[in-house]
Amino acid sequence: ETFRIRPSSFFQTNTAQAENMAHMVLRGLFDDFDNHIAAGSISERRPFTVVDAYCGVGTFALLLSRHATKVIAIEESASAIKDARWNLRETENVEILKGKVEDVLPSLTTRLDGLVIDPPRAGCQKSVLDTLIQHPVSRVVYVSCDPSTLARDLDILCHQHPAYRLHSVQPLDMFPHTAHIECVAILEHIEQ
């Protein structure tokens, strides 16, 4: 894939690991993702509405658009939105919403099948976590660049207010020879 990225927009610089991360995200949302690809039905979209929160330049939204009937991308950076619009210009099933995730997500939660959330290093705002607890999503894929804020947010979602079960957490060495890692956590809603 080729993406347009302005200097003020964020993009993973380790593209090999970014590709691994993308596959983890897709596998996390779609249980049958590997079988779907093996069967050659990669172009078949599932009746699935998914949100790409903190979508940046639209990397995950583009990949998700190939597998879900509807993708809603949320981003607050004007620069990133310009890049996302260009990167997603050939998709017909992606809607880009400008705003802060904590402001936009509450109006979407009643119609979501999946959520990809890739917040900044500070993690999710409390209001985002509150929304996920009050209006659970079937499957959440949480991509984090800070294991400590990921642990804090998972504690809230899975223990303090147990709306979700942690299915898995996979670290990725995005920056070899440094202490920085990314993690991909898969959460499943606990039916009450």
Locate predicted features.
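Rossmann-like S-adenosyl-L-methionine
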Residues: 1-192
